[in-house]
Amino acid sequence: MSGLYKILRDSLTLLKEKPIIFLPKLFSALAGSLWFIGLVSGRISLLNLLLLFGPISIIGVLASLMVASMVKQEEISLKTSFYIALSKWRQSLLLIIAFSMIGFLISLPLSIGIYWYLITGSSIILTSAAIITISLMFAFVFASYFIPITILEEKNFRSSIKESLNVSKSRPKEVTLLTMFSFLLLGLTTASNEYLEALGYIGFLLGRLTSSIATTYIFVVSPKYYLEV
């Protein structure tokens, strides 16, 4: 536990000393928020939204890789971290495709549960479906916890996935605790965002930016732990 506490503390210290690390995730959150506002407001056509979905997804992955690269090499600039992340564009595209497919499969139980609940009114089915989806999500995060840094460390996509899974399996207790911490932090942030969203689109945007701060911290903890174990 003392080792994990040190990782969490050192990650906070790094962010205090180098706040520029927040910028990639803040930019990604801003881009994603504007895309979502365009979706719900109807101000952007469906075709344009579909065309923008790919670039928005790529920005999200590149932001994660930029954070990991600045943790790995604390002395590098934001510009250098961008070029490092961009050099992994093939792995980034494969990651988007793989995560999209896995995300769809993970959401299936809950989607079926909601559909069944609307037809039958069975809360048991809905609750069971939610538990299954959350469990699958937890297992997925556990297995992929180190993917940003392993993509930078490994030569190809397959080996980076395998390395992330192997590290998680070799230290199940610590990675489980870190995964639980990530869920808790994001859960608290999401809950607090409900108050901001009452302010409308501005509140939603502020909530997303707040969440990106918590997400940045999580994406600093992951490579920090990987590089020190």
Predicted regions and their residues:
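Hydrophobic alpha-helical membrane segments
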Residues: 1-229
